[in-house]
């Protein structure tokens, strides 16, 4: 069993903010697979499908690791079988990449996951939200995408959704080679 989890903040006021790239990716996967997150437990919402669980924490970003740890423990999912989709300030909008392990790079949601699991062994799909220009990081990640940015974000989320689904059924190196080559080059 694999766990695909998107990080973000709950509530409509955050729905289309940069920090909710992970939630937007989960929405895209649900749309592609005609799945709805129909279970609520562990302070999150999720759906159990054939071979994987699709999930969103209902906590704020900085506490999202609590939900991920609880659901993974309940379903006996190892960190190496977790796929986390989240926003990344170091990538331009339209860029995305799969990564295994590494540091949190200051991302509070990833820091919490690493702390809860005492591991960084999970797979990550990093979705570019653009480089902060002249505002605080908090204000930037909580800002809305512009209309033009959202068009590009929608395009990359299609590929992110396909990559996440592919990671459930295929070798991570195969998926990384295919996805990372295509998506790290794109710049808005």
From Swiss-Prot:
The keyword Cytoplasm applies. CDD domains: PTH (cd00462). Its EC number is 3.1.1.29. GO terms for molecular function: peptidyl-tRNA hydrolase activity; tRNA binding. Its main location: cytoplasm. InterPro entries: Pept_tRNA_hydro, Pept_tRNA_hydro_CS, Pept_tRNA_hydro_sf. GO terms for cellular component: cytoplasm. Pfam families: Pept_tRNA_hydro (PF01195). The active site is at 19 (proton acceptor). Signal peptide: none annotated. It catalyses: an N-acyl-L-alpha-aminoacyl-tRNA + H2O = an N-acyl-L-amino acid + a tRNA + H(+). GO terms for biological process: protein quality control for misfolded or incompletely synthesized proteins; rescue of stalled ribosome. The keyword Cytoplasm applies. The record marks 87 as: Stabilizes the basic form of H active site to accept a proton. The record marks 9 as: Discriminates between blocked and unblocked aminoacyl-tRNA. Keywords: Cytoplasm, Hydrolase, RNA-binding, tRNA-binding. It is found in: Cytoplasm. TRNA binds at residues 14, 60, 62. Belongs to the PTH family. Monomer. Hydrolyzes ribosome-free peptidyl-tRNAs (with 1 or more amino acids incorporated), which drop off the ribosome during protein synthesis, or as a result of ribosome stalling. This is Peptidyl-tRNA hydrolase. It comes from Mycoplasmopsis agalactiae (strain NCTC 10123 / CIP 59.7 / PG2).
